Amino acid sequence: MREIVHIQGGQCGNQIGAKFWEVVSDEHGIDPTGTYHGDSDLQLERINVYFNEATGGRYVPRAILMDLEPGTMDSVRSGPYGQIFRPDNFVFGQTGAGNNWAKGHYTEGAELIDSVLDVVRKEAESCDCLQGFQVCHSLGGGTGSGMGTLLISKIREEYPDRMMLTFSVVPSPKVSDTVVEPYNATLSVHQLVENADECMVLDNEALYDICFRTLKLTTPTFGDLNHLISAVMSGITCCLRFPGQLNADLRKLAVNLIPFPRLHFFMVGFTPLTSRGSQQYRALTVPELTQQMWDAKNMMCAADPRHGRYLTASALFRGRMSTKEVDEQMLNVQNKNSSYFVEWIPNNVKSSVCDIPPKGLKMSATFIGNSTAIQEMFKRVSEQFTAMFRRKAFLHWYTGEGMDEMEFTEAESNMNDLVSEYQQYQDASAEEEGEFEGEEEEN
């Protein structure tokens, strides 16, 4: 029941995805060969959300790995859990997208997309009751952003009523990999606004900060960053995979988090984050979890929730705890910081409790917030985009692949519209309700 098909694209997506499968396999007691070595029936009860049972009792991830060059996939294949994936589910080209969105979306990616869709169909058909798809990708490169959004729009056509959840790594303000990131990211957001249901927004800088500040790592690697992301990914779906007192699934999350269809970009956080050495000295309590969860330093994207207001939020707790205490703590947060929540959506924080904590912890919590402050991030990308686009810098790489300048202009204005929508709801108050009703119907 309620299966999720996982798709990872491009270098970033494949590296995050590989880490995620290590975490999920570990939670369900699956070793790198796909054999079950767990100690509790609960690990097997709903293992089929992410795994398919193959012959001989082997468990195979419902994962599709795609890239336009073989490099990253080879390293996934030779990594710790590389042998667990179905060999047919590695779909790759040879040319690479060279950080060019147009190559991923229109030329190279378009040639490979049909073979990816064949694998997607095969995975979807082996599901009993498909809940949706989760896509891991970055928005700054060529494959994850260009081909990733192409795949999302194709899946949207074929499975219009299934949930589409993305984990999107946005270019960070200070750490830049390539000069054309603002172009690739803006073109991708333009697609995600229309075709995705829920986007969890991550960025490397915020993840680095968490590693430096909270985890006290002096030289964080991408492995450390990806570990943080996989903790959130596992937290979001734990309700589907383990029994709980208050369940959440992808659709319930969407219903509770998205007040207006375009505003589906969320900030995520995970707690407890403690440095490796100090972990065993602290027993966590629900109030402590709650406090760290709402801490701005805990957010995995470089936007400060204190600069905006929460439209909605969702807290997914794991471990043995009293639901009453969870409810009290969440209410407490809302009452104390009421100025950070919009008052025209009452009770806008949803919580769920799943009984099984992650490996090595007594209890944990995953946070998903729909905050108007996320506009800071879109604004930042948009400013960089405009600075280059005004001079038509680097455009020939895109027009050379058959793109039109109009597409850039459209993407730019769509992103600016998104920013002003967030701003509009940030400023809205319950008193002026009448003024908005007319506008609502237009959106």
Curated annotation (Swiss-Prot):
Its main location: cytoplasm. Residues 429-443 have a biased composition (Acidic residues). Pfam families: Tubulin, Tubulin_C. One of its GO terms (biological process) is microtubule-based process. Keywords: Cytoplasm, Cytoskeleton, GTP-binding, Magnesium, Metal-binding, Microtubule, Nucleotide-binding. The keyword RNA-binding does not apply. SMART domains: Tubulin, Tubulin_C. Residues 423-443 are annotated as: Disordered. GO terms for molecular function: GTP binding; GTPase activity; metal ion binding; structural constituent of cytoskeleton. The keyword Metal-binding applies. Transmembrane segments: none annotated. SUPFAM superfamilies: Tubulin C-terminal domain-like (SSF55307), Tubulin nucleotide-binding domain-like (SSF52490). Tubulin is the major constituent of microtubules, a cylinder consisting of laterally associated linear protofilaments composed of alpha- and beta-tubulin heterodimers. Microtubules grow by the addition of GTP-tubulin dimers to the microtubule end, where a stabilizing cap forms. Below the cap, tubulin dimers are in GDP-bound state, owing to GTPase activity of alpha-tubulin. Belongs to the tubulin family. Dimer of alpha and beta chains. A typical microtubule is a hollow water-filled tube with an outer diameter of 25 nm and an inner diameter of 15 nM. Alpha-beta heterodimers associate head-to-tail to form protofilaments running lengthwise along the microtubule wall with the beta-tubulin subunit facing the microtubule plus end conferring a structural polarity. Microtubules usually have 13 protofilaments but different protofilament numbers can be found in some organisms and specialized cells. This is Tubulin beta chain.
